[in-house]
């Protein structure tokens, strides 16, 4: 009702409407802060990375690029293997929900929509973030660990068997790479 009154006031209404738009813009920014420790943790994944490790016991190498997207609401980690043509490509979207006090993750890859139905949730403890994905065929657990001494990340992907036992699916180390 107040907005309608402001709009009916002509020039003053335009000014009032502009002020309301600015207030909404700043209120939206207040909900997302890159300064919180949880957002700063995700910010550590920004940049260009070489991702080396094992997948199913075989050596693999990927390029990974981390950047803030969707007006900073998510950290996107784009991963693509260095084979030509690439055999695997994925985007992981990681975000922190300050109201719930947890992280959420969407893992989208070349295998399509079926795997994208599941949203991962997790908690951070110090330099380690563990995200669980409750897939119908068995849960997955992704553990991101920041290693300050080497300025690198470890990423451990584990799958859960029907008996509840966890096993390593993939393991990677991410180190900064120079742009070419």
What residue ranges belong to the model's regions?
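N-terminal secretory signal peptides that target proteins for export/translocation
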Residues: 1-9
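Bacterial N-terminal signal peptides
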Residues: 10-27
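Hydrophobic small-molecule pocket/channel-lining residues, especially in calycin-type beta-barrels
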Residues: 30-180
